[in-house]
Amino acid sequence: MKRMRDGSYTIKPTYKVGEHDIVPDMLAKRALLHPDQVAVEQRSSVGSTRSLTTSELQRQVEYTACGLIGLGVQAGDAVAILAPTSYEWLLLDLALLSIGAITVPIYESDSAAQIEHILTDAHVTRVFTATTQQAELVHSVAPDYTVSVDSFDRGAQRMIARAATGITIENVEQRRAAISSSDIATIIYTSGTTGNPKGVALTHANFVATAEGARQVLGEVIDSPETRLLLFLPVAHVLARLVMHVILSGQGVLGFSPSIKNLLPDIQAFKPSVLLVVPRVLEKVYNAASSKAGGGIKGRMFAWSAKQARTFSVASEKTFGPSLFKKMRHGIADALVLKKIRSVLGPNLRYIVSGGAPLATDLAHFYAGMGITLIQGYGLSETTGPIAVQHIGKNPVGGVGLPLPGNFIKIAKDGEILVRGQSVMPGYYHLPEQTAEVMPDGKWFHTGDLGSIDRKGQLTITGRKKELIVTAGGKNVSPEVLEDSLATHPLIANVIVVGDQRPYVGALFTLDADMLPDWLAKHGLPQCSPTEAAELPAVRESLEKAVERANKAVSRAESIRKFRIIDATFTVANGYVTPSMKLRRRKVITDYAHEIDALYGGPISAEAPKKRGLFGRGKKN
């Protein structure tokens, strides 16, 4: 760790990215060194396991690349993938990158409007989907120019195989040799606070440097012959995508769990040593364990054991560690409850990498107290995932780690986190003005997040300058997109979309007292006050329809699940809106916290801090 004259902190990288270092080379190098190592495992729908060695996977990548060339995919073409986390996704990604094409991920949950924007903005020429239904959705929103759409369940892989006829590995190598590390490898679209999402252009160098930086500080976790990582997060997410390539380029085995419904059976079969999760998954595991314990003696036993785990973890961070008494109580808790939860997560699990959203302190201490090493970090799509990450032995709960090697982090005078280095994007795709807004000097990327750095270089996130919501599941949500749609409803005077650190998106409405009389008369209802109207089934039904319409413009994960009508008015006089009638979001959230809590059945957590650890969160767009 080194502190620079400008106040930034950095760690010197041990790997220097070369002019022609590209993402597929990471696997190719491993295939040469360890051709017989198992690289990938995936369970089939009938429970059998498919395994491929590094040399077998490399041949599959080259063969698929031949087929893509045969289909007419050119260097620089943008090709989209709309599919679950799977071996097929990986294979297509590596093959596309091997011939100089650009991979454009599309979330399975993206709305038709979002897909249409991505296809148009990135000038996508071909789309591969998992299902016919997805292919039909893409066809329905495809722009006027021709976009080829192929689905795996309609024989896309066989089509690629047929197209490979007459194309040789030499053709692939010629394409590969022409690729520069500075070429764009992918365009990732992140949710923004206004308008359509911007495309984050990331280069091969971004991925290679970030992967090597992660390996430098977390080698024992992600680059060991004992490493087994089960990937179930969407690989459209930058962190999952990065980790996928990191594991493949190391010595470990990568597994896939395409459906969250089969996650626990997949964990039991794969026996991971490390899991990459978002906090919502950890919450579900905890809640499921608590629910299974139920009430009575078992419920009290679980609550007591969970408390001992948290207490033990907190004490372990102290200079002298936990006392003998705490160790004894922890041992009892482990025998009664904790080891049973660990067994659900697999006998080999040693590490959990949590990213994408903040993780509550009490939940972090619970898992740490179970004997699992919890690793958190901070980053955005614009930084190829992690720009800061905790090191083993230097991972206090609440912090998000040290700068990833090859990157610099400093705090601006207003508290904003500024970053630069090998992991930072060159810019937004074809948007120089918007790029200049976040990189005004062409070097330092302004994250929009607030934080602090201690004397050891440990970064702590304290808040956000921008209003982007990050749900407990790690999904970025633009509240304005929904609010602008809902504000057109005649009954709605004000709306605020909420959901930060919550399991789903919600909204608070205030009724328009001026418009209400006409609306009631139009619908044949007696005149009443806004307070009384809030109780009318017809009013609620009308608002439900408005919410359904607004939700059509966003993905399922961004959709409003619940709303409340509150008895309030937001005016300039009472400080809830500005003179230009913009909502003072933080004031509303603070003053109406009880109404927000009511949407979710209570506060986030009595012990949950305001600190945030974010891997791969998209910046304001």
Residue ranges and their predicted role:
Residues 35-38, 167-189, 196, 222-228:
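Conserved pre-ATP/AMP-binding loop-to-beta segment of ANL
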